[in-house]
Amino acid sequence: MLEVLDMAPPRHQPAAGKAGGGRGHGHGHGHGGGGGGPAARKQPLQSSMAQPKAETAAATAAVAPPEGGKKCGGGGGRRRGGRGRGGRAGAGPGPGLAAAPAVVVAPAARAVIGPPVASKGLSFCRRPGFGTVGARCVVKANHFLAELPDKDLTQYDVKITPEVSSRSVNRAIMSELVRLYHDSDLGGRLPAYDGRKNLYTAGTLPFDAREFVVRLTDDDDGTGVPPREREYRVAIKFAARADLHHLRQFIAGRQADAPQEALQVLDIVLRELANRRYVSIGRSFYSPDIRKPQRLGDGLQSWCGFYQSIRPTQMGLSLNIDMSSTAFIEPLPVIEFVAQILGKDVISRPLSDANRIKIKKALRGVKVEVTHRGNVRRKYRISGLTTQPTHELIFPIDDQMNMKSVVEYFKEMYGFTIQHPHLPCLQVGNQKKANYLPMEACKIVEGQRYTKRLNEKQITSLLKVTCRRPREQEMDILQTVQQNGYEQDPYAKEFGINISEKLTSVEARVLPAPWLKYHDTGKEKECLPQVGQWNMVNKKVINGCKVNHWACINFSRSVQETTARGFCQELAQMCQISGMEFNSEPVIPIYSARPDQVEKALKHVYNMSLNKLKGKELELLLAILPDNNGSLYGDIKRICETDLGLISQCCLTKHVFKISKQYLANVSLKINVKMGGRNTVLLDAISWRIPLVSDIPTIIFGADVTHPETGEDSSPSIAAVVASQDWPEVTKYAGLVCAQAHRQELIQDLYKTWHDPQRGTVTGGMIRELLISFRKATGQKPLRIIFYRDGVSEGQFYQVLLYELDAIRKACASLEPNYQPPVTFVVVQKRHHTRLFANNHKDRSSTDKSGNILPGTVVDSKICHPSEFDFYLCSHAGIQGTSRPAHYHVLWDENNFTADEMQTLTNNLCYTYARCTRSVSVVPPAYYAHLAAFRARFYMEPEMSENQTTSKSSTGTNGTSVKPLPAVKEKVKRVMFYC
């Protein structure tokens, strides 16, 4: 086993500024002055990771803030067994942890009897109380209170014969059944149906089991077969009573598991009417009538819609309504659609092979209706495009194989003269018996969602449509609720569900911005951000890097050497002004190269520089890129980071021609952290005043998994983990990446073992490597772990926590027996639909410039989970559109954070993001993990997307092999190369 953890740690020196004292600036936030003060915290820590549990518990308790907002579930105080797996708070240690003696607390501490353990055997962290820090205010949330019905709900099994795969057809069958039998056999009941095998009623039906016969005329299925009447047998059989008692218990916090069945019933009931009115996609509904569709280009248009979901919250059941938009195929005549795709007049000349293939891809699977038969609007699904133009197409008209041309057939049969015989025909219906339809005789059917990848222009257009100011967004949501008319909804009435038409008013708090520390040689040594923003004027980075040896390569034909040289000099000067030691001259003259020669050019510049430096390293490469550079950016990053071991900074041509001080300042910040410097640190960090970070060596992780885009069936998913490499500053983050099975959400390489012929069983993985790296960087071993995990949906919480917490434990134990630092595991979510609005949009003191709620606004009541530890935090100032708060859910907490401590730490970290002088919307470690995962996509060789395997491939949980990514060079992965 690799021994890296047995030397006594040197006493740690903070980055800069006054370690220890430091001005308080009115901070403290109810944390008892930091719990023990700087002096107590700077004692040398025990060197062994096998530190006795009792001592750790005692040490942690010694620096705990005063009694008051501590953990419930056994009496408060900080204990290592705070939230063990399989029990409530205080119910004992988690796996791999020896039991620690409980800390004795005063009788005044609250004692709460926890609810029963979750049936899964693992309970998520209970809410420790509510936060109190910050200026109190009221915000409005797009949650609408739903009153629970007091009726019994009954579930019935449905079996339709012959079996139908289409939900819409199933719904049509059930609608016809209800129409025929509502007043008779169904006893006046109006059931809600999920479109599959479940039917729900308020109360019971007059029977336990019955079979019905329903006749339905087929809707056009696009195959071209004439519609006919079909007979279906529908068997309805009693299945179970859906008990709402457990849902009430869960909302009251007296039950651990959310009763999914009861929630599902209510969700289906409230979606029943919308399913009939709108196009349903996932949890959203779309219609061209909600707002006028906007053209996105290339034959697409945006449809406005709304998201709807029923959720259990502290205030009771809540209906979450949000606006959404997505791309639909514009219902154009096919000729017009083709003209938009090709961006030119297609009527006048034949299609080239390349254009024909492009059109075939765009039209395959699309439903069209014919326009040459008057009122007969038969529908067909396009299966392909003919290779020949229409005037060359012939087909047999009888068994004797007498042939007729398509042009003649349409003239004789329908009196339709084909105007553009040089264009190919659409092939529709069955491939074996192809039917030909002239493009000009077809129109695209309305309401077809576009599922392929959008191009950049379309994405920009769609974002413009969805970008609505908070006031407009709020009005749209309220209007949607009124249009949906839940009061008049016959299904809601039937089941006794009442929906409020008012946004929920929620008590919130605005957390104060943290003081930031800059270098003492700058005019401004400390800075207090205003409304989530500040700037670098009169400030110098707290730890400036040294760049002695750099080179520049110019891939832009339009940038002359003198222009490039002037830009590089300006950038070097800005780096110096910002506090870096930056050589004004490159190692070799600026080298111009063609983008298609990227690898050759990079290696040439690298080798030329090494020859000139006589054994010294080239430290930084600047690259000037054309504005539209295709794969060039990714190629540069891949070659520099996985082949040459070189840090690079790319700059676009438009910025070289139009040099702005703001741009140069931002680039200099990126260069500084890429080269190992620090831009700023929290004043509280270097003053040893951050609860549950400053008291003992603490490592903060961020993790994310990014998946390939829709349509990429075999590309691997990319997992990234970053971890802080400095303490107490927690500002520098090293990052590791790995490829794993397609759409695999669990991070496979957190901890791994493999057999080596020489060394036997070898242990490794990203957590282990980053723990070792922290020790090397700080001389300390982490005695506490805080893990921010991005990209996990609610349905995956349990699985992700179980797998990844276990991997963290194993990684720690592999370094030293009994090494189990306490872990806090927090899921970060941005893809939710909760929006927060100012209570009064006219009150400028309660909004930022964009009309959004103020940065630092936190909500942990009313719309949050009934009993678990979660909160919404809007940590950033809005720029355009409506801000989306991040949702943080603490799934596991052995460090016993109070609500204030977790919320304040998370908010303060959002001011340490290295790439800009703004607070960001997601906690930086999670943000960095996302950047690192995104960067790693560039490392994949083109053939990796073809799912090729190699002898060194790693195997995902579903058994598929994934080719590993090329390794990032050692000196690159030590720094924030992904910024």
Swiss-Prot record:
<dbReference type="InterPro" id="IPR036085">
    <property type="entry name" value="PAZ_dom_sf"/>
</dbReference>
<feature type="domain" description="Piwi">
    <location>
        <begin position="620"/>
        <end position="941"/>
    </location>
</feature>
<dbReference type="GO" id="GO:0005737">
    <property type="term" value="C:cytoplasm"/>
</dbReference>
<dbReference type="InterPro" id="IPR003100">
    <property type="entry name" value="PAZ_dom"/>
</dbReference>
<dbReference type="Pfam" id="PF02171">
    <property type="entry name" value="Piwi"/>
</dbReference>
<dbReference type="InterPro" id="IPR032473">
    <property type="entry name" value="Argonaute_Mid_dom"/>
</dbReference>
<dbReference type="GO" id="GO:0003723">
    <property type="term" value="F:RNA binding"/>
</dbReference>
<dbReference type="InterPro" id="IPR045246">
    <property type="entry name" value="Piwi_ago-like"/>
</dbReference>
<keyword id="KW-0943">RNA-mediated gene silencing</keyword>
<dbReference type="GO" id="GO:0019827">
    <property type="term" value="P:stem cell population maintenance"/>
</dbReference>
<comment type="similarity">
    <text>Belongs to the argonaute family. Ago subfamily.</text>
</comment>
<dbReference type="InterPro" id="IPR032472">
    <property type="entry name" value="ArgoL2"/>
</dbReference>
<dbReference type="InterPro" id="IPR032474">
    <property type="entry name" value="Argonaute_N"/>
</dbReference>
<dbReference type="InterPro" id="IPR014811">
    <property type="entry name" value="ArgoL1"/>
</dbReference>
<feature type="compositionally biased region" description="Low complexity">
    <location>
        <begin position="54"/>
        <end position="67"/>
    </location>
</feature>
<keyword id="KW-0217">Developmental protein</keyword>
<dbReference type="InterPro" id="IPR012337">
    <property type="entry name" value="RNaseH-like_sf"/>
</dbReference>
<dbReference type="Pfam" id="PF02170">
    <property type="entry name" value="PAZ"/>
</dbReference>
<feature type="compositionally biased region" description="Basic residues">
    <location>
        <begin position="77"/>
        <end position="86"/>
    </location>
</feature>
<feature type="domain" description="PAZ">
    <location>
        <begin position="333"/>
        <end position="446"/>
    </location>
</feature>
<dbReference type="Pfam" id="PF16488">
    <property type="entry name" value="ArgoL2"/>
</dbReference>
<protein>
    <recommendedName>
        <fullName>Protein argonaute PNH1</fullName>
    </recommendedName>
</protein>
<dbReference type="Pfam" id="PF08699">
    <property type="entry name" value="ArgoL1"/>
</dbReference>
<dbReference type="GO" id="GO:0004521">
    <property type="term" value="F:RNA endonuclease activity"/>
</dbReference>
<dbReference type="GO" id="GO:0048366">
    <property type="term" value="P:leaf development"/>
</dbReference>
<dbReference type="InterPro" id="IPR036397">
    <property type="entry name" value="RNaseH_sf"/>
</dbReference>
<dbReference type="Pfam" id="PF16486">
    <property type="entry name" value="ArgoN"/>
</dbReference>
<dbReference type="GO" id="GO:0005634">
    <property type="term" value="C:nucleus"/>
</dbReference>
<keyword id="KW-0963">Cytoplasm</keyword>
<comment type="function">
    <text>Probably involved in the RNA silencing pathway. May bind to short RNAs such as microRNAs (miRNAs) or short interfering RNAs (siRNAs), and represses the translation of mRNAs which are complementary to them. Plays a role in the maintenance of the indeterminate state of the stem cells in the shoot apical meristem (SAM). Regulates leaf formation through vascular development and may be involved in determining the central domain of the leaf founder region.</text>
</comment>
<feature type="region of interest" description="Disordered">
    <location>
        <begin position="1"/>
        <end position="95"/>
    </location>
</feature>
<dbReference type="InterPro" id="IPR003165">
    <property type="entry name" value="Piwi"/>
</dbReference>
<dbReference type="GO" id="GO:0031047">
    <property type="term" value="P:regulatory ncRNA-mediated gene silencing"/>
</dbReference>
<dbReference type="Pfam" id="PF16487">
    <property type="entry name" value="ArgoMid"/>
</dbReference>
